Amino acid sequence: MTIQPFTMSAQTSGNRFEAGKGTFLLNGEPFVVKAAELHYPRIPRPYWDQRIKLCKALGMNTVCLYVFWNAHESQPGVFNFEGQNDLASFCELCKDNDMYVILRPGPYVCAEWEMGGLPWWLLKKKDIRLREDDPYFMERVAIFEEAVANQVKHLTIQNGGPIIMVQVENEYGSYGINKKYVSEVRDIVRKNFGEVTLFLCDWASNFTNNGLDDL
């Protein structure tokens, strides 16, 4: 078996990453994802580069990161992607360090973060059903995912960037069974991020409850 050598020094648009039969494929060659988990809002910005370099020194080739909705949209329609919240710059730093990125934009992320990343103001609508195919919730999810994509969709691997995969929701099987909701989130993510590889993350014991054929 040939393992794709890790380098992004010559990375250009037109690259591709996909799930093959029993292995991931980077430009058609088997690729082993060795991922570290780094959450940029939790790390002071002056230390971002150092933390990424430490992960690479440990033998990692990829950074997984959550996008915390309530960190970026503290009020409806008011977005902050600057300073500590500069998602694009963090992804660019990963690329500068020859690290790929797995993006996990929720909408729910858990991560021992307040409301799993969901904004508090969603609860002002008394009858809202969070993490369900509730019309208002899905409307706000669509707005948020579009805002995130506008920051980093140019950084997907197809566009010469480091983002190889984007996660849909997070461990939803531990919360409920609603394939309609999961499929709606998938469609929103697909619409905004294009042809990047999408995936679900769930416990094996309940993965099939919400699993979709293309995730």
Regions found by a protein language model. Give the residues of each.
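N-terminal carbohydrate-binding accessory modules
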Residues: 1-62, 92
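Acidic-and-aromatic substrate-binding clefts and catalytic sites of carbohydrate-active enzymes
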Residues: 15, 40-46, 72-73, 77-82, ...
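Hydrophobic faces of well-ordered beta-strands that scaffold small-molecule active sites
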Residues: 32-36, 61-65, 101-105, 164-168, ...
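Active-site beta-loop-alpha junctions enriched in small/polar residues
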Residues: 38-39, 68, 106-110, 168-173, ...
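Residue-level preference for long, well-ordered alpha-helices that form the structural scaffold
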Residues: 44, 79, 83, 130-137, ...
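Aromatic-lined substrate-binding rim segments of carbohydrate-active enzymes
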Residues: 48-114, 120-122, 185-196, 213
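Active-site-adjacent "subsite" loops/lids of carbohydrate-active enzymes
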Residues: 109-150
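Active-site neighborhood of glycoside hydrolase catalytic domains
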Residues: 136-214
